[in-house]
C-alpha cells in the first residue's frame, strides 16, 4: 500500500492477501505509512529473501519458456504512469501476452506478472501470477 500524489491510499494485491491473513498486520502497514516513527517494519528474514529470489528466478524462467515457444510478448517497463499507459496500449493492440502489466481501479492498483489473452477472444485477458505466495505450499 502507498499514498498517491493526492494522499489517497492505494492497495495492491499483496495488501489484500495480507489483510486476509492478518487484518492486524495490514493495519500496522497502514500505520507505518502515516506514522513511520512508531511503526517500523522488520527486516526481511533470510528465508523470506530466499523465497522471493526463487520466485523471481521462476518468473524469469517461465518468461523465457514463453519466448522459446515464440509467443507474442509485450514487456512493460517504467513507472506506474508509463506502465499503465503501455498496458492499455498493449491490450488495444491485442498482444497475446503482456508481461509486468500495470492495472488500476482506485483504490486498487498493482502489477500483474502476466496478462494472457484468452484463446478465441481478442479482448479478454487472464491474470497469471507466478510468485504471489510468501511461503512454500
Segments predicted by a language model, with ranges:
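Metal-dependent nuclease catalytic cores that hydrolyze phosphodiester bonds in DNA/RNA
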Residues: 1-121
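A conserved hydrophobic secondary-structure block that centers on an alpha-helix together
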Residues: 121-137
